Amino acid sequence: SNLAPSLAVEIRASDGASDYGNKFGEPVVLGFTRSFDLTLPSGERWGWIKKIMFTGGIGQIEARHIEKGEAEKGMLIVQVGGPAYGIGVSGGSASSKLQGENEEELDFNAVQRGDAEMEQKMNRVIRACIEMDDHNPIVSVHDQGAGGPANVLKELGEKAGGKIELRRIKLGDPTLSVLKIWIAEYQERCGFLIG
């Protein structure tokens, strides 16, 4: 089975969140984990298959940055962040299933791999744009998650439509198929609508 013991998940997840946050420059300041595993005297085992960890940070945002703008003809759809790898494929689907229900290889491939240094670089781009005040070119920004560019870039264009030049996406793995470039959830990447 590819299920880790509850205690190992709680310790490693907590260590990972703290390590990532510290490398990124925004330490995790709150959080908790939750699991349950009980073996009854009869030998029957009761427990939660998926352990849960919640973490959080504290931030602020100016009111004018709360509303995202609408796509209009002539705007650019761009991405900033890490290069494309074949990781996080089917991550959205895998997160909706019971852990261990899939094949081990599918479970492994669906897991994203964080890159705190790249996350910090991407965050600096966003922050630099925000600090331009009224000259901020960002109309809308979406974090790339489940579905990869296939999801985030379509969300940005929505009703206005747009042209996506898939072959201009920077690749970390030059052997990726067009399908994997389009759907993989490679990490630390955002899509931007630039006006």
Q: What are the functions of these language-model segments?
A:
Residues 1-195:
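Glycine/proline-enriched, intrinsically flexible loops and inter-domain linkers
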